[in-house]
């Protein structure tokens, strides 16, 4: 993927916003990258891969742990399965999973994609905190079930499906890693954090995904352009129409966020949304527990990424207000 670099000062206040956040969270390095009107207009890196004095500097090929931003790749794999006619969003998940549990009978793939399934794991047992389609809750079990459905129905792992795209886009700084290497940042976190885990799996079903800032931005650009890159339609545009359009059931309360295929999609601003209120309808975003954020604003032909090597938030830090400010600052720059 070839993009011209035309750096400008239009988004300097966004860089300042990300630098301020990097000072508030427990990180040793960060970056920001913006594509606007098909040009790279902002690209900045600062800090080091870890807190060690001799740590590698954050740079173009530095790969950040993206945490839940990995769900954008899982969402793509599910959309691929839908586009291939292998599954439907309103299929009950029991059609594909041999889990003998009465609470799953009315849970659909749509519910998993939009965090409206109501499922959770408690002491290793599957429970349901609300009837599928009636509320919204961010739980990891939905992602596990989606990756299983992808593997069962396509015969491929999430990683195998998206690797086909990575090859077409010539991505070399995106992947799931069972072993660390010098280009991967150290993830700074509290000792014993229960939300942190590592994995040897490289199937795309676990949290061990690392991506460079520039390739994450280009992944967003791939979505913005609905797969049409350098005059070539890499994959069917229908995949992106599925991924980035609102899929949430209309039975949930208006205070809850609206989702596409795991992406947060802007409709009306809601109390629990991670998208800033200034962002127009149709904008879509995904945020990781490391603070890594990928935002696409189709109305303004813009993709923005921020990345940090922290994990979780310090006490008193309002991560939702912070990520909304990131998006709202971008809009202020666009409209000023």
Curated annotation (Swiss-Prot):
The keyword Isomerase does not apply. InterPro entries: Beta-lactam-related (IPR001466), Beta-lactam/transpept-like (IPR012338), Diverse_Enzym_Activities (IPR050789). Keywords: Plasmid. The keyword DNA-binding does not apply. Pfam families: Beta-lactamase. Coiled coil: none annotated. This is Uncharacterized protein BpOF4_21049. The lineage of its organism: Bacteria, Bacillati, Bacillota, Bacilli, Bacillales.
């Amino acid at each position: 993927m070839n993009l011209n670099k035309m750096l400008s000062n239009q988004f300097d206040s966004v860089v300042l916003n990300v630098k301020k956040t990097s000072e508030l969270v427990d990180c040793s390095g960060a970056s920001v990258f913006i594509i606007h009107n098909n040009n790279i207009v902002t690209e900045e890196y600062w800090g080091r891969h870890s807190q060690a004095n001799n740590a590698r500097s954050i740079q173009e090929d530095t790969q950040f742990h993206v945490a839940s931003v990995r769900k954008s790749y899982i969402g793509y794999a599910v959309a691929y399965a839908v586009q291939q006619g292998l599954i439907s969003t309103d299929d009950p998940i029991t059609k594909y999973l041999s889990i003998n549990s009465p609470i799953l009978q009315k849970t659909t793939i749509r519910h998993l994609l939009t965090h409206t399934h109501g499922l959770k794991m408690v002491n290793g047992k599957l429970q349901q905190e609300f009837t599928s389609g009636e509320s919204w809750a961010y739980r990891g079990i939905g992602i596990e079930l989606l990756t299983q459905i992808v593997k069962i129905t396509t015969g491929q792992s999430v990683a195998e499906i998206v690797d086909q795209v990575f090859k077409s886009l010539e991505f070399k700084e995106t992947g799931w890693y069972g072993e660390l290497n010098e280009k991967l940042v150290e993830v700074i976190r509290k000792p014993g954090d229960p939300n942190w885990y590592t994995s040897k799996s490289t199937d795309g079903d676990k949290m061990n995904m690392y991506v460079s800032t520039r390739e994450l931005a280009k992944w967003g650009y791939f979505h913005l352009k609905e797969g049409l890159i350098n005059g070539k339609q890499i994959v069917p545009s229908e995949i992106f129409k599925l991924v980035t359009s609102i899929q949430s059931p209309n039975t949930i309360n208006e205070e809850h966020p609206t989702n596409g295929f795991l992406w947060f999609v802007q409709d009306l601003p809601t109390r629990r949304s991670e998208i800033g209120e200034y962002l127009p309808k149709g904008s879509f975003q995904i945020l990781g527990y490391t603070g890594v954020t990928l935002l696409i604003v189709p109305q303004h032909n813009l993709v923005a990424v921020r990345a940090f090597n922290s994990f979780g938030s310090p006490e008193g830090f309002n991560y939702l207000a912070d990520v909304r400010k990131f998006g709202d600052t971008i809009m202020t720059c666009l409209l000023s």
